[in-house]
């Protein structure tokens, strides 16, 4: 499953799915489990690219040495967008919307007091670094994956997205003086999505960049340094992450910074283009996001391809949780450099874990990042 911080829903492709895209994936149903219980409750969700629908089922989810009885979605239809996505479902780890009726996996873990702390730590890898898997740690942070201390930013008003205030973007050492911007931290989005005027300004500072519709091209050899400032801390966005596939013109690549207003006029989607440069922590107790510079091995050249990424679309959820807020949230983001997560349950874990990182239960599983995805609901 794809780990998605931009959504709280968890679902898999069901064995009863009739859509062509389901044939490209592993499915799950009654023939795979004797304990699955299918309900009459319908669900559907439209992401930035793609839509799925189906029914809610209940079954036991097993991972990291213990079992969790949980409801989740079983997709009976899925749009063709999912044909090429290398995943068989989505594990939603975004904050739960207060209006949602179905508890999330994270809520159940918290209710049963299975975690050392009610936090999640995520480390994404790059293909160009020779590894396609990242790591997610439930209940703790992996200090071997980042340098320095974690800096925490409070989630802005609204609360059901990991949305934090953004100070500014700096290009080759020069601030662009953005004001009142916020960013949704979203592992389910491949790109960095900004309203057109914001994306125009950034690319105007990259030599020999050009625009076509919502897309931009830049020289494949560009060395322009981009930094994102959050809570007073600057985080690099390296060229190997924002310089994407080679276009039809030799030496010219597509930029993965996209000029598309996916949400509000001052809201950005901070996808994998940004997240591959940081270690990110999601604190459910204190409603905040922690960031630190990620440790990684350097490589010289980004991967190239003759195919540009598909155009993103902006669709809101239908019949499920409400879509993202239209108005940009504003709040003062606070920074903590203690490097310590918030304290969670003090109850002993109910099951041992083969990947325990301490005397308490800390769950670690591996994740892959799919290309050209925009997943928020």
Curated annotation (Swiss-Prot):
GO terms for cellular component: plasma membrane; side of membrane. It is a lipid-anchor; GPI-anchor. One of its GO terms (molecular function) is aspartic-type endopeptidase activity. Its main location: membrane. Keywords: Aspartyl protease, Cell membrane, Glycoprotein, GPI-anchor, Hydrolase, Lipoprotein, Membrane, Protease, Virulence. Its EC number is 3.4.23.-. Residues 328-351 have a biased composition (Low complexity). The keyword Membrane applies. A lipid is attached at residue 350 (GPI-anchor amidated serine). One of its GO terms (biological process) is proteolysis. Pfam families: Asp. It is found in: Cell membrane. The active site is at 4, 186. Glycans are attached at residue 58. Residues 296-351 are annotated as: Disordered. Residues 1-292 form the Peptidase A1 domain. It is an enzyme of class 3 (hydrolase). Residues 351-377 form a propeptide. Belongs to the peptidase A1 family. Secreted aspartic-type endopeptidase which is secreted and contributes to virulence. This is Probable aspartic-type endopeptidase CTSD. It comes from Arthroderma otae (strain ATCC MYA-4605 / CBS 113480).
């Amino acid at each position: 499953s794809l780990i998605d911080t931009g959504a709280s829903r968890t679902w898999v492709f069901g064995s009863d799915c009739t859509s062509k895209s389901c044939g490209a994936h592993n499915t799950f149903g009654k023939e795979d489990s004797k304990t699955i219980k299918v309900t009459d409750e319908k669900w559907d969700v439209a992401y930035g690219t793609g839509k799925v629908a189906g029914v809610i089922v209940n079954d036991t989810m097993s991972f990291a040495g213990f079992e969790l009885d949980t409801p989740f979605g079983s997709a009976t239809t899925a749009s063709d967008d999912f044909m090429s996505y290398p995943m068989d479902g989505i594990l939603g780890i975004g904050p739960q919307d207060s209006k949602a009726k179905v508890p999330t996996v994270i809520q159940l873990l918290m209710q049963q007091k299975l975690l050392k702390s009610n936090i999640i730590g995520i480390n994404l890898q790059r293909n160009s670094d020779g590894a396609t898997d990242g790591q997610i740690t439930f209940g703790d942070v992996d200090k071997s994956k980042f340098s320095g201390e974690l800096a925490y930013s409070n989630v802005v008003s609204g609360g059901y997205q990991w949305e934090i205030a953004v100070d500014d973007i700096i290009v080759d050492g020069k601030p662009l003086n953005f004001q009142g911007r916020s960013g949704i931290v979203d592992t389910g989005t491949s790109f960095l999505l900004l309203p057109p005027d914001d994306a125009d300004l950034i690319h105007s500072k990259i030599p020999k960049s050009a625009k076509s519709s919502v897309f931009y091209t830049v020289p494949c050899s560009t060395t322009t340094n981009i930094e994102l400032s959050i809570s007073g801390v600057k985080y690099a966005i390296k060229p190997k992450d924002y310089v994407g596939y080679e276009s039809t013109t030799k030496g010219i690549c597509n930029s993965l910074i996209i000029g598309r207003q996916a949400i509000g006029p001052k809201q950005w989607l901070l996808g994998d283009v940004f997240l591959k440069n940081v270690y990110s922590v999601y604190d459910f107790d204190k409603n905040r996001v922690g960031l630190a510079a990620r440790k990684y091995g350097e490589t010289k050249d980004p991967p190239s391809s003759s195919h540009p990424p598909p155009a993103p679309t902006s669709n809101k959820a239908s019949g499920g949780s409400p879509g993202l807020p239209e108005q940009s949230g504003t709040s003062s983001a606070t920074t903590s450099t203690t490097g310590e997560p918030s304290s969670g349950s003090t109850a002993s874990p109910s099951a041992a874990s083969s990947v325990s990182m301490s005397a308490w239960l800390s769950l670690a599983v591996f994740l892959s990042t799919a290309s050209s995805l925009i997943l928020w609901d």
